[in-house]
């Protein structure tokens, strides 16, 4: 799936949170591939910058906050501290 397809699934409030979180992790993988780093580097950056652990239980609004940060990384509007 593409980043855009995964983004839509993260935003789809009809899906279970666990499913949406899985798609958020897939978005992190797309960002990692674009930046040439491992997925865990991106997931750690999300946790550091937003306080949201994509591996743990999350709320819907947290997924959207994490997604916004992933979008910023993807578009070069935010930087990794790697």
Task: Describe the residue ranges of each PLM region.
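Alpha-helical propensity feature that highlights long, continuous alpha-helices across diverse contexts
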Residues: 1-82
